[in-house]
From Swiss-Prot:
GO biological process, one term: peptidyl-lysine hydroxylation to 5-hydroxy-L-lysine
Cofactor field: Fe(2+)
Keyword annotations of the record: Apoptosis, Chromatin regulator, Cytoplasm, Dioxygenase, Iron, Metal-binding, Nucleus, Oxidoreductase, Transcription, Transcription regulation
EC number(s) reported in the record: 1.14.11.-
Gene Ontology terms: cellular component: cytoplasm; nucleolus; nucleoplasm; nucleus
Organism ancestry: Eukaryota, Metazoa, Ecdysozoa, Arthropoda, Hexapoda
Function, in words: Dioxygenase that can both act as a histone arginine demethylase and a lysyl-hydroxylase. Negative regulator of apoptosis; functions upstream of hid possibly by acting on the JNK signaling pathway. Not required for apoptotic cell clearance by macrophages in the developing embryo. May be involved in regulation of chromatin structure, promoting expansion of euchromatin. May be involved in regulation of behavior and circadian rhythms.
Composition bias, Gly residues: 393-408
Positions of Fe cation binding: H192, D194, H278
Record note on cofactor: Binds 1 Fe(2+) ion per subunit.
Enzyme class, first EC level, given as a word: oxidoreductase
Basic residues composition bias: residue spans: 8-22
Gene Ontology molecular functions: histone H3R2 demethylase activity; histone H4R3 demethylase activity; metal ion binding; P-TEFb complex binding; peptidyl-lysine 5-dioxygenase activity
Name of the protein described by the UniProt record: Bifunctional arginine demethylase and lysyl-hydroxylase JMJD6
């Protein structure tokens, strides 16, 4: 019997509606669980974590910049959550009670608009689902809602990541940058690079996340799942770990593109430098907060990509920087936009998994729309980008526009 039939009637009805809108291509009775990953998920735990850990209390900001941020080196940070109210408040039971009738984004429809679900229904779905790649909350608008914004009181930005240069664009114009993310085992984020050269941090409050990270020079064709391999689930994290990951463990896989692997536990924060490919699979029920950022350290790359990908936004940004941060405006003026940044982009103009390497052409490398996101660290999915591109080509506008504010 499908897990949907185990849900209360109203939850079952709402879950079906959300699924129909978010993934209309999965239209068969058993399409959501055709691969039966729920029954064969145990082997996905079998890997070796190989990423360095540091303690926030033992590494000052200046040392973090020199050891990790400036050389674009991933790391796991412990101790960032000390004193966070989220440790106590962010449980399934408490979230289902406090935010029971609040709607959170868990997908997008074919027009690129948000598909939302009430928290009470989503928690019931989480606790019963046997879907191969379940619905996943990835809400960037929670901070704009008078009730959901209370989540902001439950955490603080870790000390290494408080340099927030996109704030000078204005809260209504800046690209989406923070997400409340929550999902069951087998949900997750397909392989991607975060937008506009931004770096990201992801702090896990509950559960475990499995990460694979690859340096920016890794050719896209090595990492992307083809239609032949993944079918209708080609963009899903569990599909990537089933099809591409085994190849990364073969002797024939290029040594310079070996993955960094992480099992992130509750209380740990993963730092993802700009330009790094990464894929994330939830191993059990997870709740996390993640933010993308531009700092003084990564500003040259972020500025370069923003000018190329979001020219109107860059002009507004530069006007404010000239007034409030003239030293950064001077850096912006000195950057040669005709030179490559050396960092790849998960380009919306070339989303085919069989396409050429992301570093093979300057035009592809620098194409990045920086739109709304639905992942663990801020990059928009290829599926969402294609939907949005179709809508814009047809003259659509409104809440799905790419003006930097999130859809709600």
């Amino acid at each position: 019997m499908s897990e949907e039939f185990k849900l209360p009637k109203r939850s079952r009805k709402r879950t079906r509606e959300v699924k129909r809108k978010a993934r209309p291509e999965l239209d068969g009775e058993n399409a959501w669980s055709a691969m039966r990953y729920c029954e064969k998920f145990e082997p996905f735990w079998d890997f070796t974590d190989n990423l360095e850990r540091i303690e926030e209390s033992q590494v000052p900001e200046s040392e973090f910049i020199e050891r990790f941020e400036r050389p674009y080196k991933p790391v796991v940070i412990r101790g960032c959550t000390d004193g966070w109210l989220a440790l106590e408040k962010w449980t399934l039971a408490r979230l289902a009670k406090k935010y029971r009738n609040q709607k959170f984004k868990c997908g997008e429809d074919n027009e690129g608009y948000s598909v939302k679900m009430k928290m009470k229904y989503y928690v019931e779905y989480m606790q019963s689902t046997r879907d191969d790649s379940p619905l996943y909350i990835f809400d960037s608008s929670f901070g704009e809602h008078h009730r959901r914004r209370k989540l902001l009181d439950d955490y603080v930005v870790p000390k290494y990541f408080r340099d927030d240069l996109f704030q000078y664009c204005g809260e209504n114009r800046r690209p989406p940058y923070r997400w409340f993310v929550m999902g069951p085992a087998r949900s997750g984020t397909g392989i991607h690079i975060d937008p506009l050269g931004t770096s990201a941090w992801n702090t896990l409050i509950r559960g475990h996340k499995r990460w694979c990270l690859f340096p920016t020079q890794t050719p896209k064709e090595l990492l992307k799942v083809t239609s032949a391999m993944g079918g209708k689930q080609r963009d899903e994290a569990i599909t990537w770990f089933s099809t591409i990951y085994p190849r990364t463990q073969l002797p024939s896989w290029p040594e310079q593109y070996r993955p960094i692997e992480v099992l992130q536990g509750a209380g740990e924060t993963v730092f993802v430098p700009g330009g790094w490919w990464h894929v994330v699979l939830n191993m059990d029920d997870t709740i996390a907060i993640t933010q993308n950022f531009s700092s003084q350290t990564n500003f040259p790359c972020v500025w370069h990509k923003t000018v190329r990908g979001r020219p109107k936004l860059s002009r507004k940004w530069l006007r404010v920087l000239r007034d409030q941060r003239p030293e950064l405006a001077q850096i912006a003026d000195s950057i040669n936009l005709n030179e490559s940044t050396g960092f790849a982009s998960d380009s919306s103009s070339n989303s085919s998994s069989s396409s050429s390497s992301s570093s093979s052409s300057s035009e592809e490398e620098e194409s990045d729309d920086g739109g709304d996101s639905n992942t663990d660290s801020g990059q928009e999915s290829l599926t969402a980008k294609k939907k949005k591109k179709r809508r814009m080509a047809g003259g659509g506008s409104g809440s799905g526009s790419m003006g930097g504010s999130s859809r709600s």
